[in-house]
Amino acid sequence: MKIAMLADVFFPDTVGGAGRVAYHLSRQLCRKGHDVHVLTRNPEGKLSRQQQVEDDLFVYRFKLPAKEGLRFFLSELRNSSTAAKKANQEIGFNLLCSHQSLVASGPLFSRPISRIPFVHFFHSPWHEEYLIKKRNSEGKTPQSAKVIAMFMREMEKRILSKALKIFVLSSYSAGQIAAIHHLPPEKVVKIPAGIELDRFRFPQSGKELLKKELNIALDKTAFFTVRNLVPRMGIETLIEAFKQSNVLRQKGVLLIGGEGLLRKTLQAMVKDYDLEESVKFLGRISENDLPRYYQAADFFVLPTRELEGFGLVILESMACGTPVLATPIGAIPETVGVFDKNLLFEGTSGENIRRKLEDVINRFESYRFDPQVCRKFVEERYSWEKMADAFEKEVMGLLKTAV
């Protein structure tokens, strides 16, 4: 197949789960003998316009303004369409696969691209993500944002309706499609996400030595999280849990990786609550160091408040042998809950999180999991190879039907 992969976010240009899914799926499809051409954003034209990542994996970046707004939106519609048409003239695609609605909207409704068989990956509802971003500290959303969100919702429905198949990573996401867009369930296909098992693995030097290397206290329970620092991730609530607890202050340490618009707010919270000895900000963690932090931690914590369509960090941590404590939000129960329901918080509040983390410290042996068991759970269920196999099987059947 000659596949055009349309993605607003793509690893390593950006961090985050959706970009990694697009990257690893593309990479595995190339290894299966397909030609994959990725069309993605290039804010302010800072990255190379065209790049050959592997023998049959090419990335084409279309220029966009740095700041989001109407100009950004219109530029993406126009420039993604232009890039797709130009690439199609040279290559002749027989499949379009998009991972976000905006990047697909320009190409899909312009000829001759609109005639190419099309499938879509639904990671999360576009309009809900937008509303969460626009919500202020008091929990209120401007009316203008609500109007824009209505438009986004309808635009996404048009994209999903046009798709021959809609791929999701979880039953939770499949349920969102049914509840929000009322599309027939037979259009939706759940396929497993993947994990780089050769990169996310057990520490070679042992956890204690790794803690020393990373300057993590040996006499405290190490809780690690890495997220985009935005409101829906629940990092504020995790910090609140430490504020409420002398046990966590004295016997625990929280390591926060990642960047985002809340970074300064979160740092101010830690300072105001006098938590600087208990809560550490690591900033953006390099790809080389990320597995080391998973390996060194006693537990990974996922305090998500809203919209967790899958959670690749769960697989990454467990592949390193480190169990995950998490809120029961979105698709999280489909991984963490299946492994062990006792690792789920009762809810998303700081009190819910505090009680569980204190219990972990006070009854550490009750939460001790064999690292081999954690890793085996991932090995048996998730790999990028399995994902590519499932995707290939589904779309090859579609293309045969379309001929």
Language-model region placement:
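Acceptor-binding helix/loop patch of EC 2.4 sugar-transfer enzymes
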Residues: 66, 119-157, 198
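Carbohydrate-associated surface elements
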Residues: 172, 194
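Nucleotide-activated donor-binding/catalytic signature segment of Leloir-type glycosyltransferases, i.e.
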Residues: 264-285
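Short alpha-helical donor nucleotide-sugar binding micro-motif in glycosyltransferases
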Residues: 284-285, 292-297
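Short hydrophobic beta-strand element within catalytic cores of glycosyltransferases
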Residues: 314, 323-326
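Conserved acidic donor-binding segment of nucleotide-sugar-dependent glycosyltransferases
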Residues: 338-351, 359-365
